[in-house]
Amino acid sequence: MSDYVLAVAAADLPPGQAAEVTVAGQVVAVFNVGGTFHALAGRCPHRGGPLGQGFVDGPQVSCPWHNWTFDVTTGENVAGPDMKVPRYEVKVEDGQVLVRIG
């Protein structure tokens, strides 16, 4: 799939917050970092914790299950690049956050 799909209304995701949404059948975590939106696969690669329900601190999110922390702009684990979460392209049009899966 190469098209962008609606994930969330931008107004519903204030800065410093995350949302867990389903986009094209996949769980996606969407983040607002200072007004810029980012999207990662919604499950932590460690044990499958819900990243969209994690603790957001600037450009980082910590998994609520075991505190693994990822950079939402790159998907990289801050402790080392051996664990990475897939990152998705994001754009905002007409107040809607759109995510491209694929």
What are these regions (language model features)?
Residues P81:
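Glycine/small-residue-rich loop that forms an oxyanion/phosphate-binding "nest" at active or ligand-binding sites
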Residues M1-G58, D71-V72, E76, K84-G102:
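N-terminal pre-ligand scaffold of iron-sulfur
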